[in-house]
């Protein structure tokens, strides 16, 4: 870190992560921030901060709905310049490529066109159905195809979405609660089923 910027430790970079058991949705590790020597309230960035997900959202909002519509990894898609649209990170365009290649190379133009075909409303409905909290207002904007949200997403939401993909589409709601008992010790909720 740059000592001129972070000598007081207030401006150092922060990070957050949520790791879950994909088969259950149970949180196994969570990082909410750097260690802080503060009394009182501290922000847990894994649950309370919403950030732009960038390309990590593409499988969830673009490609899963596109595959469910009947396309395959071998479907031919167009990687081409889009007027008033995104550019690819490397500044190049490959023309006709397979969806598999587009995903593996994270081609922004393909993600943009896929969501445009599906409609942002359809793509955002996948997020809403998986418990994403702050995406409802972006359902008309194609920028969400490449992670451009008004408020962003949390690491907890992203972990749940990827767990759903890992479980062949079976929803995995993320939870830190493993069990709840009533005053008599009877189990009223058990996350294991």
Each model region followed by its residue ranges:
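Extracytoplasmic
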Residues: 12-15, 26, 56-57, 72, ...
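Active-site SXXK
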Residues: 25, 50-77, 102, 160-165
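Extracytoplasmic/secreted proteins, especially bacterial periplasmic and envelope-associated proteins
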Residues: 26, 52, 61, 72, ...
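Conserved catalytic neighborhood of penicillin-recognizing serine enzymes
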Residues: 71-124, 171, 183-193
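Second-shell loop/turn segments in exported
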Residues: 5-6, 44-52, 87-92, 98, ...
């Amino acid at each position: 870190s740059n000592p001129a910027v972070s000598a007081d430790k207030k401006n150092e970079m922060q990070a957050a992560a949520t790791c879950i058991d994909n088969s259950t949705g149970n949180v196994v590790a969570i990082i909410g921030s750097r260690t802080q020597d503060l009394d009182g309230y501290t922000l847990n960035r894994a649950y309370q901060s919403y950030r732009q997900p960038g390309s990590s959202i593409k499988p969830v909002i673009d490609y899963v709905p596109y595959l469910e519509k009947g396309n395959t990894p071998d479907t031919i898609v167009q990687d081409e310049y889009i007027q008033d649209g995104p550019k690819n990170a490397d500044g190049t365009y490959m023309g006709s490529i397979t969806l598999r290649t587009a995903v593996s190379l994270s081609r922004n133009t393909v993600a943009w066109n896929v969501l445009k075909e599906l409609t942002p409303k359809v793509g955002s409905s996948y997020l809403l159905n998986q418990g994403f909290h702050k995406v409802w207002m972006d359902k008309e904007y194609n920028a969400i195809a490449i992670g451009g949200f008004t408020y962003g997403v949390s690491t907890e939401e992203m972990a749940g979405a990827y767990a759903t993909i890992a479980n062949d589409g079976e929803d995995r709601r993320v939870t830190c609660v493993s069990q709840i008992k009533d005053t008599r010790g009877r189990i009223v909720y058990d996350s294991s089923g």
